[in-house]
């Protein structure tokens, strides 16, 4: 962990899921209630360092690198779908062997933890999803309105193009950090530096590139199971915190009606924050999360 995040940093561990060696970090405090932090797409587990540092005195905190992300193995083929991600989380929890669990996820990670919570509601204490309800309803309608042959053609063409898509390289860490800050203008300098250091790998030619598989960008051609996902949301028995950045592209789950599928939810909208709420307004986010969890943050 960088000096900005404090502490000595987490320890690295691995587990296996579907023959892939996957990575996770452990922030210590074993014996306390388990808290798992799940990152979003094209991100990495160390983006949770600041959050984990605040919560490790209350929880045994761990955070996985999703398949194809960070220091986890890349899938062979195109196996980057929600079923695989949820299975990986279930496998991690079986590997750790602690229950029940509190889950926090961002974006794709938020969708993953909500799926898991709906499949295994008895295993959960509380769930927090930061913009983790999936694509906005209008986008889903647009995509699902296309015939299957068009969706299949688009997917095939995307998959065929990915081998020729060269990952972006940066001559220095400073260049990579500049790109990080341009994509996330709300980031503090310390946060941008931290996310960059842990988000890149140095190549043989001396350049840097982001630590994720380009194939994670592709989504499958089959329709998003709106009714199935809503059923899973409705099966969650534990309290749910839904967080959204007021300046994000993500749809408001209260006004668009999706929040009504949860039995027991709290909604928090954070001003001057985009999609990465926990980075953009860290202290405000921690206030909401700490209040929801019932701990000092």
Regions found by a protein language model. Give the residues of each.
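Conserved HGGG/HGGXW glycine-rich cap/lid loop of the alpha/beta-hydrolase fold
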Residues: 25-74, 258
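Conserved alpha/beta-hydrolase catalytic His-Asp/Glu region
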Residues: 164-223
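Catalytic histidine-centered segment of alpha/beta-hydrolase-like enzymes
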Residues: 273-286
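Conserved loop-alpha-helix segment in the C-terminal half of the alpha/beta-hydrolase fold
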Residues: 230, 234-273
């Amino acid at each position: 962990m960088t000096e900005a995040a404090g502490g000595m940093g987490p320890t690295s561990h691995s587990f296996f899921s579907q023959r892939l060696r996957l990575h996770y970090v452990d922030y210590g405090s074993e014996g306390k209630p388990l808290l798992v932090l799940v990152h979003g797409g094209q991100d990495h587990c160390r983006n949770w360092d600041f959050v984990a540092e605040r919560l490790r005195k209350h929880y045994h905190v761990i955070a996985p690198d999703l398949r194809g992300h960070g220091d986890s193995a890349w899938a062979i083929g195109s196996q980057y779908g929600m079923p695989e991600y949820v299975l990986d989380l279930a496998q991690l929890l079986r590997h750790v062997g602690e229950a029940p669990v509190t889950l926090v996820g961002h974006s794709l990670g938020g969708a993953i933890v909500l799926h898991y919570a709906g499949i295994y509601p008895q295993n959960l204490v509380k769930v927090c999803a930061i913009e983790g309800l999936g694509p906005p309803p209008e986008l889903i309608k647009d995509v699902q309105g296309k015939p299957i042959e068009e969706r299949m053609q688009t997917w095939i063409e995307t998959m065929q193009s990915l081998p020729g898509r060269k990952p972006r390289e940066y001559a220095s860490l400073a260049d990579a950090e500049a790109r990080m800050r341009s994509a996330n203008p709300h980031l503090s300098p310390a946060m941008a530096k931290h996310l960059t250091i842990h988000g890149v790998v140095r190549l043989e030619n001396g350049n840097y590139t982001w630590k994720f598989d380009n194939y994670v960008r592709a989504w499958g051609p089959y329709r998003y199971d709106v009714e199935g996902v809503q059923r899973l949301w409705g099966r969650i028995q534990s309290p749910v915190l839904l967080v959204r950045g007021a300046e994000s592209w993500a749809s408001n789950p209260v006004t668009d009606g999706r929040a009504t599928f949860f039995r027991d939810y709290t909604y928090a909208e954070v001003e001057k924050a985009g999609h990465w709420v926990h980075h953009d307004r860290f202290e405000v986010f921690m206030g909401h999360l700490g209040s929801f969890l019932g701990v000092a943050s």
